[in-house]
Amino acid sequence: MKSSDYILGYIISLLPIVLIQNILFFLTAIIMGLEFTISIIPTVLVSMIISIFFISLGILIGSLVNEKGTGGLGSIIVQLVCFTSGMYFPVEAIGGVFEIICKSLPFEACLTIIQGTLHNDFNNLTLIHTIVFLIYFIAVILLSIIVFKKRMISDNK
């Protein structure tokens, strides 16, 4: 089995879990006051695409470090995503170099894409958001395949 087959199989096997997680998330949000609109459906689909990026990032991390290091590194990545996506506060509030770094990472683009889809408001969504996300999306998938393949070869020696 090629490493790309293994990674693709792993991603595909997690998509039903991602779908269930999204449905439960939006049901909870509706119970807590989110108005049900038809835009929730495309938001779930967009979220699933973005989830593929994060699954691939997890595979990449798992291929780079041993099982003891993945927990700590995973926690650091989660906080990095939260701080650089604008999830806690708008990145424009800090501005400067921090804003430039955040806008060059895929996390702010992911949040903007999901928010725009959910609110049916694509005014803040630019081509740059899509390009930044796609570059990281493709790069992380390719890197995870390459690193996983090298890890498989080194483990078989």
Predicted segments — roles?
Residues 23, 27, 56, 89-96, ...:
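Transmembrane alpha-helix boundary/anchor motif
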Residues 3, 7-72, 79, 129-130, ...:
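Alpha-helical transmembrane segments and their short interhelical loops
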Residues 105-121:
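Short, membrane-exposed interhelical loops at transmembrane-helix boundaries
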Residues 29-30, 59-63, 86, 100-103, ...:
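Transmembrane helix-loop junction
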Residues 65-104, 108:
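Transmembrane helix segments
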Residues 118, 132-157:
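Junction motif at the cytosolic side of a transmembrane helix
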Residues 16-20, 119, 146:
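N-terminal hydrophobic signal/anchor transmembrane helix of membrane proteins
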